[in-house]
Amino acid sequence: MKQPVELPEINENGYYEIRLESIGGLGANLCGKLLGELGALYLGLNSASFSSYGSEKRGSPVKAYIRWCGEDREVRVNSPVTNPHILGLFHEAMAGKLPVTAGFTETSKVVINSDASPKEIRQRLKLHGGWVYCVDALKIAMESKSRINMVMLGAIVKAAGFIPLEPVEMLVKDTLGKKYPDLLEKNLEGVRRGYEEVRHEAFKPDGKFEEVPYKEPENEWGYENAPIGGVNIRFGSTVSNDLSPSREGYIPLFIQDKCINCGLCDSTCPDMVFQFKPGTYRGKEAMVNCGLDYHHCKGCLRCVDVCCLLYTSRCV
Protein backbone atom coordinates (compact mmCIF):
# COMPACT_ATOMS: atom_id res chain seq x y z
CA MET A 1 0.00 0.00 0.00
CA LYS A 2 1.42 3.35 -1.06
CA GLN A 3 1.69 6.34 1.27
CA PRO A 4 2.43 9.16 -1.21
CA VAL A 5 4.81 11.82 0.07
CA GLU A 6 5.98 15.18 -1.20
CA LEU A 7 9.71 15.74 -1.56
CA PRO A 8 10.80 18.63 0.70
CA GLU A 9 13.51 19.80 -1.73
CA ILE A 10 14.94 18.91 -5.12
CA ASN A 11 18.03 19.91 -7.06
CA GLU A 12 18.21 21.79 -10.35
CA ASN A 13 17.34 18.60 -12.25
CA GLY A 14 14.26 17.92 -10.13
CA TYR A 15 15.67 15.04 -8.06
CA TYR A 16 16.09 14.24 -4.37
CA GLU A 17 19.41 12.38 -4.16
CA ILE A 18 21.10 10.05 -1.67
CA ARG A 19 24.65 8.72 -1.76
CA LEU A 20 25.89 5.83 0.40
CA GLU A 21 29.61 5.35 1.05
CA SER A 22 30.65 2.03 2.51
CA ILE A 23 33.00 -0.91 2.56
CA GLY A 24 32.09 -4.29 1.09
CA GLY A 25 30.38 -6.51 3.64
CA LEU A 26 28.37 -3.86 5.51
CA GLY A 27 25.32 -4.06 3.24
CA ALA A 28 25.26 -0.66 1.51
CA ASN A 29 24.38 -2.24 -1.84
CA LEU A 30 21.26 -3.87 -0.39
CA CYS A 31 20.38 -0.71 1.56
CA GLY A 32 20.51 1.28 -1.68
CA LYS A 33 18.24 -1.22 -3.43
CA LEU A 34 15.75 -1.06 -0.56
CA LEU A 35 15.70 2.75 -0.65
CA GLY A 36 15.06 2.59 -4.39
CA GLU A 37 12.15 0.19 -3.91
CA LEU A 38 10.85 2.27 -1.02
CA GLY A 39 10.44 5.32 -3.24
CA ALA A 40 8.93 3.51 -6.22
CA LEU A 41 6.60 1.03 -4.51
CA TYR A 42 5.64 2.64 -1.22
CA LEU A 43 6.05 6.44 -1.42
CA GLY A 44 4.46 7.18 -4.80
CA LEU A 45 7.71 8.43 -6.36
CA ASN A 46 9.68 7.63 -9.45
CA SER A 47 12.95 6.13 -8.35
CA ALA A 48 16.33 4.86 -9.53
CA SER A 49 19.12 3.15 -7.62
CA PHE A 50 22.43 1.62 -8.63
CA SER A 51 25.77 0.79 -7.06
CA SER A 52 29.42 1.13 -7.93
CA TYR A 53 32.12 -1.20 -6.62
CA GLY A 54 35.26 -2.99 -7.75
CA SER A 55 36.02 -6.56 -6.75
CA GLU A 56 32.94 -8.09 -5.15
CA LYS A 57 34.40 -8.94 -1.76
CA ARG A 58 34.49 -7.66 1.80
CA GLY A 59 36.74 -4.67 2.38
CA SER A 60 36.53 -3.05 -1.07
CA PRO A 61 34.98 0.45 -1.42
CA VAL A 62 31.28 0.51 -2.29
CA LYS A 63 29.05 3.40 -3.36
CA ALA A 64 25.29 3.31 -3.79
CA TYR A 65 23.21 6.04 -5.42
CA ILE A 66 19.47 6.72 -5.09
CA ARG A 67 17.37 9.28 -6.95
CA TRP A 68 13.75 10.15 -6.24
CA CYS A 69 11.41 12.47 -8.10
CA GLY A 70 7.68 13.08 -8.46
CA GLU A 71 5.53 10.79 -10.58
CA ASP A 72 5.15 13.59 -13.13
CA ARG A 73 8.87 13.43 -13.96
CA GLU A 74 11.01 10.60 -15.35
CA VAL A 75 14.43 9.68 -13.98
CA ARG A 76 16.71 10.21 -16.96
CA VAL A 77 20.05 10.61 -15.15
CA ASN A 78 22.20 7.61 -14.28
CA SER A 79 25.46 9.33 -13.35
CA PRO A 80 26.92 9.30 -9.80
CA VAL A 81 25.32 11.56 -7.19
CA THR A 82 27.68 14.51 -6.78
CA ASN A 83 25.79 16.74 -4.31
CA PRO A 84 23.63 14.48 -2.13
CA HIS A 85 20.77 15.68 0.00
CA ILE A 86 21.61 12.76 2.31
CA LEU A 87 25.05 11.17 2.62
CA GLY A 88 25.24 7.80 4.38
CA LEU A 89 28.63 6.74 5.80
CA PHE A 90 28.63 3.12 6.95
CA HIS A 91 31.93 3.43 8.84
CA GLU A 92 33.66 6.51 10.24
CA ALA A 93 37.13 5.06 9.50
CA MET A 94 36.56 5.81 5.81
CA ALA A 95 36.93 9.54 6.48
CA GLY A 96 40.37 10.83 5.59
CA LYS A 97 41.30 7.80 3.49
CA LEU A 98 38.70 8.36 0.79
CA PRO A 99 36.99 11.62 -0.30
CA VAL A 100 33.65 10.41 1.07
CA THR A 101 32.38 13.89 1.94
CA ALA A 102 33.06 15.38 -1.50
CA GLY A 103 30.04 17.33 -2.72
CA PHE A 104 28.58 17.71 0.79
CA THR A 105 27.04 21.17 1.19
CA GLU A 106 25.74 23.24 4.09
CA THR A 107 22.19 22.06 3.34
CA SER A 108 23.10 18.36 3.18
CA LYS A 109 22.63 15.74 5.89
CA VAL A 110 25.18 13.06 6.76
CA VAL A 111 24.14 9.86 8.54
CA ILE A 112 27.14 8.04 10.00
CA ASN A 113 27.66 4.77 11.84
CA SER A 114 29.50 6.00 14.94
CA ASP A 115 29.21 6.13 18.72
CA ALA A 116 30.68 9.64 18.76
CA SER A 117 28.69 12.85 19.15
CA PRO A 118 27.64 14.95 16.14
CA LYS A 119 30.08 17.67 17.20
CA GLU A 120 33.00 15.19 17.25
CA ILE A 121 31.99 13.79 13.87
CA ARG A 122 31.80 17.27 12.36
CA GLN A 123 35.43 17.81 13.44
CA ARG A 124 36.60 14.43 12.13
CA LEU A 125 34.87 14.82 8.77
CA LYS A 126 35.92 18.49 8.50
CA LEU A 127 32.47 19.49 7.33
CA HIS A 128 31.87 23.03 6.07
CA GLY A 129 28.37 22.93 7.57
CA GLY A 130 25.17 20.92 7.41
CA TRP A 131 23.33 18.35 9.50
CA VAL A 132 25.13 15.48 11.25
CA TYR A 133 23.20 12.35 12.30
CA CYS A 134 25.03 9.75 14.42
CA VAL A 135 23.84 6.23 15.19
CA ASP A 136 25.85 3.40 16.77
CA ALA A 137 24.75 0.93 14.11
CA LEU A 138 27.36 -1.69 15.03
CA LYS A 139 26.24 -1.84 18.66
CA ILE A 140 22.54 -1.91 17.76
CA ALA A 141 23.11 -4.61 15.12
CA MET A 142 24.94 -6.83 17.62
CA GLU A 143 22.30 -6.34 20.32
CA SER A 144 19.35 -6.94 17.99
CA LYS A 145 21.19 -9.65 15.99
CA SER A 146 20.35 -7.65 12.87
CA ARG A 147 22.71 -6.12 10.30
CA ILE A 148 24.36 -2.72 10.09
CA ASN A 149 22.50 -1.87 6.88
CA MET A 150 19.10 -2.34 8.57
CA VAL A 151 20.05 0.09 11.33
CA MET A 152 21.39 2.58 8.80
CA LEU A 153 18.19 2.24 6.75
CA GLY A 154 16.13 3.33 9.76
CA ALA A 155 18.49 6.21 10.54
CA ILE A 156 18.50 7.47 6.93
CA VAL A 157 14.70 7.40 6.82
CA LYS A 158 14.59 9.42 10.06
CA ALA A 159 17.11 11.94 8.71
CA ALA A 160 15.04 12.45 5.55
CA GLY A 161 12.27 13.84 7.74
CA PHE A 162 9.36 13.18 5.39
CA ILE A 163 9.14 9.36 5.38
CA PRO A 164 6.87 7.53 7.87
CA LEU A 165 8.26 4.42 9.52
CA GLU A 166 5.28 2.24 8.51
CA PRO A 167 6.09 1.92 4.78
CA VAL A 168 9.70 1.08 5.66
CA GLU A 169 8.54 -1.77 7.90
CA MET A 170 6.21 -2.94 5.14
CA LEU A 171 9.13 -2.89 2.68
CA VAL A 172 11.28 -5.03 4.97
CA LYS A 173 8.44 -7.52 5.48
CA ASP A 174 7.73 -7.80 1.75
CA THR A 175 11.38 -8.23 0.72
CA LEU A 176 13.63 -9.61 3.45
CA GLY A 177 10.70 -11.17 5.29
CA LYS A 178 9.98 -13.51 2.39
CA LYS A 179 13.62 -14.42 1.82
CA TYR A 180 14.70 -14.67 5.48
CA PRO A 181 11.51 -15.16 7.52
CA ASP A 182 13.44 -16.32 10.60
CA LEU A 183 15.31 -12.99 10.73
CA LEU A 184 12.33 -10.71 10.08
CA GLU A 185 11.71 -9.56 13.66
CA LYS A 186 15.43 -8.99 14.26
CA ASN A 187 15.72 -6.89 11.10
CA LEU A 188 12.60 -4.91 12.01
CA GLU A 189 14.06 -4.23 15.46
CA GLY A 190 17.25 -2.97 13.83
CA VAL A 191 15.29 -0.60 11.57
CA ARG A 192 13.18 0.71 14.46
CA ARG A 193 16.14 1.26 16.76
CA GLY A 194 18.06 3.03 14.01
CA TYR A 195 15.04 5.28 13.45
CA GLU A 196 14.59 6.01 17.16
CA GLU A 197 18.15 6.18 18.48
CA VAL A 198 19.83 8.39 15.88
CA ARG A 199 21.15 11.70 17.32
CA HIS A 200 21.55 14.84 15.27
CA GLU A 201 22.79 18.41 15.32
CA ALA A 202 22.93 21.20 12.75
CA PHE A 203 26.08 23.22 12.05
CA LYS A 204 26.20 26.55 10.26
CA PRO A 205 29.25 27.41 8.13
CA ASP A 206 31.70 29.11 10.50
CA GLY A 207 34.85 29.20 8.41
CA LYS A 208 36.55 26.29 10.20
CA PHE A 209 36.56 24.04 7.16
CA GLU A 210 36.25 24.55 3.42
CA GLU A 211 33.55 22.95 1.31
CA VAL A 212 34.99 20.01 -0.66
CA PRO A 213 33.78 19.92 -4.29
CA TYR A 214 33.03 16.58 -5.91
CA LYS A 215 35.42 15.16 -8.47
CA GLU A 216 35.92 11.73 -9.94
CA PRO A 217 38.70 9.74 -8.21
CA GLU A 218 41.85 9.46 -10.28
CA ASN A 219 45.44 8.27 -9.86
CA GLU A 220 48.29 10.77 -9.65
CA TRP A 221 50.14 8.87 -12.37
CA GLY A 222 48.64 7.74 -15.65
CA TYR A 223 49.84 6.88 -19.12
CA GLU A 224 50.41 10.57 -19.92
CA ASN A 225 52.61 11.52 -16.94
CA ALA A 226 54.12 8.29 -15.57
CA PRO A 227 57.96 8.12 -15.69
CA ILE A 228 59.24 6.21 -18.71
CA GLY A 229 60.18 2.70 -17.68
CA GLY A 230 58.71 3.16 -14.21
CA VAL A 231 56.78 0.33 -12.59
CA ASN A 232 54.33 0.76 -9.71
CA ILE A 233 54.44 -2.67 -8.08
CA ARG A 234 51.77 -1.69 -5.53
CA PHE A 235 49.14 -0.56 -8.03
CA GLY A 236 45.85 -2.25 -7.19
CA SER A 237 47.45 -3.98 -4.21
CA THR A 238 45.96 -4.22 -0.72
CA VAL A 239 49.37 -4.20 0.97
CA SER A 240 48.61 -0.86 2.66
CA ASN A 241 44.87 -1.40 3.17
CA ASP A 242 43.44 -1.26 6.69
CA LEU A 243 40.54 -3.71 6.47
CA SER A 244 39.43 -3.38 10.10
CA PRO A 245 36.46 -1.10 9.22
CA SER A 246 34.72 -3.98 7.43
CA ARG A 247 34.35 -5.98 10.66
CA GLU A 248 30.89 -6.46 12.12
CA GLY A 249 31.77 -6.68 15.80
CA TYR A 250 33.83 -9.88 15.88
CA ILE A 251 37.46 -10.84 15.26
CA PRO A 252 39.18 -14.24 15.33
CA LEU A 253 41.26 -14.87 18.46
CA PHE A 254 44.35 -17.02 17.77
CA ILE A 255 45.52 -19.39 20.55
CA GLN A 256 49.09 -20.22 19.59
CA ASP A 257 49.77 -22.75 22.37
CA LYS A 258 47.08 -25.05 20.97
CA CYS A 259 47.78 -24.56 17.25
CA ILE A 260 48.94 -27.69 15.36
CA ASN A 261 50.22 -25.67 12.37
CA CYS A 262 47.98 -27.45 9.88
CA GLY A 263 47.69 -24.29 7.77
CA LEU A 264 43.95 -24.57 7.10
CA CYS A 265 43.38 -21.06 8.41
CA ASP A 266 45.98 -19.68 6.00
CA SER A 267 44.43 -21.61 3.10
CA THR A 268 40.95 -20.22 3.66
CA CYS A 269 41.88 -16.63 4.55
CA PRO A 270 41.06 -14.36 1.55
CA ASP A 271 43.57 -11.71 2.68
CA MET A 272 46.50 -13.88 3.84
CA VAL A 273 46.62 -12.37 7.33
CA PHE A 274 48.29 -15.34 9.02
CA GLN A 275 52.04 -14.95 9.52
CA PHE A 276 54.49 -17.88 9.41
CA LYS A 277 58.19 -18.07 10.21
CA PRO A 278 60.78 -20.88 10.47
CA GLY A 279 60.77 -22.60 13.85
CA THR A 280 60.32 -25.95 15.54
CA TYR A 281 57.15 -27.91 16.19
CA ARG A 282 57.22 -31.18 18.15
CA GLY A 283 61.00 -31.26 17.90
CA LYS A 284 61.14 -30.82 14.13
CA GLU A 285 61.92 -27.83 11.95
CA ALA A 286 58.73 -26.37 10.50
CA MET A 287 57.02 -23.18 9.41
CA VAL A 288 55.27 -22.07 12.59
CA ASN A 289 52.02 -20.10 12.63
CA CYS A 290 52.60 -16.83 14.52
CA GLY A 291 49.03 -15.57 14.33
CA LEU A 292 47.20 -12.77 12.54
CA ASP A 293 48.11 -9.36 11.24
CA TYR A 294 44.92 -7.63 12.39
CA HIS A 295 45.62 -4.64 10.15
CA HIS A 296 44.47 -6.75 7.20
CA CYS A 297 41.83 -8.84 9.03
CA LYS A 298 38.27 -7.95 8.04
CA GLY A 299 36.55 -10.32 10.48
CA CYS A 300 35.04 -12.76 8.00
CA LEU A 301 35.68 -15.57 10.56
CA ARG A 302 36.36 -18.19 7.89
CA CYS A 303 39.38 -19.28 9.91
CA VAL A 304 37.11 -19.95 12.89
CA ASP A 305 34.85 -22.16 10.79
CA VAL A 306 37.67 -24.15 9.20
CA CYS A 307 39.92 -24.66 12.27
CA CYS A 308 40.08 -28.44 12.71
CA LEU A 309 40.50 -28.19 16.50
CA LEU A 310 38.45 -25.01 16.97
CA TYR A 311 41.46 -23.34 18.58
CA THR A 312 40.69 -20.15 16.73
CA SER A 313 37.68 -18.54 18.40
CA ARG A 314 35.42 -15.53 18.08
CA CYS A 315 36.21 -12.47 20.12
CA VAL A 316 34.01 -9.40 20.47
Q: Where is each model-derived feature located?
A:
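Cysteine-centered iron-sulfur cluster-binding motifs in ferredoxin-type domains/subunits
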Residues: L253-M272, G291-L309
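Ferredoxin-type iron-sulfur electron-transfer modules in oxidoreductases and energy-metabolism complexes
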Residues: V151, M170-D174, N241-D242, R247-E248, ...
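Conserved small/polar residues in nucleotide/adenosyl-binding loops
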Residues: Y311-V316
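Short amphipathic alpha-helical segments
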Residues: Y16, Y250-P252, V288
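Active-site cofactor/cluster-binding pocket
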Residues: M1-G230, R234-V239, D257
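Residue-level detector of anion-binding/catalytic polar loops
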Residues: L45-N46, W131, C265, Q275, ...
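Flexible loop/turn segments at secondary-structure boundaries
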Residues: G27, E56-K57, N261, F276, ...
